């Protein structure tokens, strides 16, 4: 199995290290042709407007969207989630991939200094609580009817799934706990 990591910005190395720790080969996705050799893709955190600009410049936006619409499993964390979303409440003109039927609000928990971590129950990955690290995180403010909510914090979804797409408002790659990545890998292997 080969998992791609959208290698534009953000926590690329951290996701790569986690996947390699799990024995998974990784591909740093920088060009459309990289999408042809992967079994799933991670869209890491970063700055969502920058992601879009670079995706467009590298002709990756449409190619990635087509792959996702056709079933390529994806996991978006933080800004990656924003990129996957259908709507951005506080930036309605920002273009997104529109493959996850959610509305998000960018930087909803505040600025960098308001970043925090907390432990939550996520039943789909086991009984033990999971440390969720929020860094200038988005909030999911609305979900479509086919979106499953796997975890919440303060009554807001923080981990959702729709078809082949996982979306997280937090950064699982910044923990030592591989369970979120393991869950994603199960989705990639069918």
Swiss-Prot record:
Signal peptide: none annotated. One of its GO terms (biological process) is pyridoxal phosphate biosynthetic process. Catalyzes the hydrolysis of glutamine to glutamate and ammonia as part of the biosynthesis of pyridoxal 5'-phosphate. The resulting ammonia molecule is channeled to the active site of PdxS. In the presence of PdxS, forms a dodecamer of heterodimers. Only shows activity in the heterodimer. Pfam families: SNO. The gene is pdxT. CDD domains: GATase1_PB. InterPro entries: Class_I_gatase-like (IPR029062), PdxT/SNO (IPR002161), PdxT/SNO_CS (IPR021196). Keywords: Glutamine amidotransferase, Hydrolase, Lyase, Pyridoxal phosphate. Belongs to the glutaminase PdxT/SNO family. L-glutamine binds at residues 46-48, 106, 135-136. It comes from the Bacteria. PROSITE patterns: PDXT_SNO_1, PDXT_SNO_2. This is Pyridoxal 5'-phosphate synthase subunit PdxT. The active site is at residues 78, 171, 173. One of its GO terms (molecular function) is pyridoxal 5'-phosphate synthase (glutamine hydrolysing) activity.
